[in-house]
Swiss-Prot record:
Keyword list, A-Z: Amino-acid biosynthesis, Arginine biosynthesis, Cytoplasm, NADP, Oxidoreductase
Pathway: Amino-acid biosynthesis; L-arginine biosynthesis; N(2)-acetyl-L-ornithine from L-glutamate: step 3/4
Main location class: cytoplasm
Subcellular location per the Swiss-Prot or TrEMBL entry: Cytoplasm
Protein name (record): N-acetyl-gamma-glutamyl-phosphate reductase
Gene: argC
Active site: 149
Catalytic reaction annotation: N-acetyl-L-glutamate 5-semialdehyde + phosphate + NADP(+) = N-acetyl-L-glutamyl 5-phosphate + NADPH + H(+)
EC number per UniProt: 1.2.1.38
Free-text function comment from the UniProt entry: Catalyzes the NADPH-dependent reduction of N-acetyl-5-glutamyl phosphate to yield N-acetyl-L-glutamate 5-semialdehyde.
Uppermost EC category: oxidoreductase
Pfam family, any one: Semialdhyde_dhC_1
GO molecular function, one term: N-acetyl-gamma-glutamyl-phosphate reductase activity
Length: 344
C-alpha cells in the first residue's frame, strides 16, 4: 500500500481527497493534518466518512509527513512551497493542489499572488499535472503541480484544436461558471446562502489568478503565445464548472468533431457528447470526468463554441490529484476514480 499524507484536510478540496483516498484500493491514509482540528477524529468532522476513515487530525509535522510515500497539499497558496523542499529531501513525493508550483516564472507568480516564491529552484522541476497533456512526464515525478479548476476545463476544451493547429488567428474567449464550493469553505459574506442563492455574477473580470496559468498551459501545447479573455462567474450551485469557449477555427464542424473524437478516443475521463449536444455539470458531478460539446454558430464557418464541463472539486482538484498519483506510482490511471455521476 502507498502511504499517503494530506496537509489541509478540512476544506472542500481536502474533504474530497479524503473521500477518494478512503476508497482507493492501493492507498492508505497515514497522516491527515489540520492546525485548527488537531486531536479531532476525521469522522467527527466529516460524518459521511464514518466507517471508512478512522484517523485523527494532527498538527502539521514535517518529520511525520516525511515518512509518507506521497503528501498532498490541499492548503492556501504559499503553504506548500514552505514545506516541499524538506519533504523532497527526505524522499517523499509531493502533489500540490494549490498554485505554488503551477507558474514557471517566479516573477509572474509574485505579480499575481502578491508574495515572493520561497523555492523558485523547484519551479522548473515541478510537473504540471494535466495527464491528458503531460502524461509521460508523470511517472517517477517527485513534485507535481495540480492544475487549477478553470485551467483544467479550458485546457481540455482546447487541447485538440491547439495540437492540430486548427485554432485560427482571432480572439479566444473563455466564459466560465463555477459552483460556490470553488470559493472554499471559509465563511465569507459573498458565499453566504442569502448572498449567493438566486444570483449570478461575474468576478475577477479585470484579472483572475488563473489567467496566467491558462495562457501558460495553452502556450505550451500550441508552441506559441495564446491570448485569452477569461471571465469567471459564480453560480448558485454547490459543485460543477462549465467553460464556454469561443474561438476562431480553420475547419468545419464535422471535421472538428472527428478531430475531438480521435484525440480523446483513448482518454478514460474525457468524452465528446453526441453531435449537437449540450453537456451539463450534473453529468459529471462527483466524478473525474470531463464532457465536451462542439457547436458552430449559423453562417459562421470560421467560429466554434466549445462547451467543457467538469466537477470543480474532482477533475478540477482532488480527482485529478489522485489521477496524477496513479501515474506517478505506476498504477492504473483510473484506480480509485471509477464511477459515474448520480442523476437526477
Amino acid at each position: 500500500m502507498i502511504e499517503v499524507g494530506i496537509v489541509g484536510g478540512t476544506g472542500y478540496t481536502g474533504m474530497e481527497l479524503l473521500r477518494l483516498v478512503a476508497r482507493h484500493p492501493k492507498l492508505r491514509l497515514a497522516e491527515i493534518t489540520s492546525r485548527a482540528e488537531a486531536g479531532t477524529r476525521v469522522d467527527e468532522l466529516v460524518p459521511a466518512l464514518e466507517g471508512a476513515v478512522d484517523n485523527v487530525f494532527t498538527a502539521p509535522d514535517t518529520e511525520r509527513l516525511s515518512r509518507c510515500d506521497v503528501v498532498f497539499f490541499a492548503t492556501p497558496n504559499g503553504i506548500a512551497m514552505e514545506s516541499a523542499p524538506a519533504l523532497l529531501e527526505a524522499g517523499c513525493r509531493v502533489i500540490d493542489l494549490g498554485a505554488d508550483f503551477r507558474l514557471r516564472d517566479p516573477a509572474v507568480w509574485t505579480e499575481w499572488y502578491g508574495m515572493s516564491h520561497s523555492c523558485p529552484e523547484l519551479l522548473e522541476e515541478a510537473v504540471y499535472g494535466l495527464p491528458e497533456a503531460n502524461r509521460d512526464a508523470l511517472p517517477g515525478a517527485r513534485l507535481v503541480a495540480n492544475p487549477g479548476c478553470y485551467p483544467t476545463a479550458v485546457a481540455l476544451g482546447l487541447l485538440p484544436l491547439l495540437e492540430a493547429g486548427a485554432l485560427a488567428d482571432g480572439p479566444v474567449v473563455a466564459d466560465c461558471k463555477s459552483g460556490v464550493s470553488g470559493a472554499g469553505r471559509a465563511a465569507k459574506v459573498a458565499t453566504l446562502f442569502c448572498e449567493a442563492n438566486e444570483g449570478f455574477k461575474a468576478y475577477g473580470a479585470s484579472g483572475h489568478r488563473h489567467l496566467p496559468e491558462i495562457e501558460q498551459t495553452l502556450a505550451r501545447v500550441a508552441g506559441a503565445p495564446v491570448d485569452v479573455t477569461f471571465v469567471p462567474h459564480l453560480v448558485p450551485m454547490t459543485r460543477g464548472m462549465q467553460a464556454t469557449l469561443h474561438v476562431v477555427v480553420d475547419r468545419p464542424l464535422d471535421e472538428l468533431e472527428a478531430l475531438y473524437r480521435q484525440r480523446y478516443a483513448d482518454e478514460p475521463f474525457v468524452h465528446l457528447v453526441a453531435s449537437g449536444g449540450h453537456p451539463e455539470t450534473r453529468w459529471v458531478r462527483g466524478t473525474n470526468h470531463c464532457r465536451i460539446g462542439l457547436h458552430q454558430p449559423p453562417g459562421r464557418p470560421d467560429r466554434a463554441v466549445i462547451l467543457s464541463v467538469i466537477d470543480n472539486l474532482t477533475k478540477g482538484a482532488a480527482g485529478q490529484a489522485v489521477q496524477n498519483l496513479n501515474r506517478m506510482f505506476g498504477l492504473e490511471e483510473t484506480a480509485g476514480l471509477e464511477g459515474l455521476a448520480y442523476v437526477p
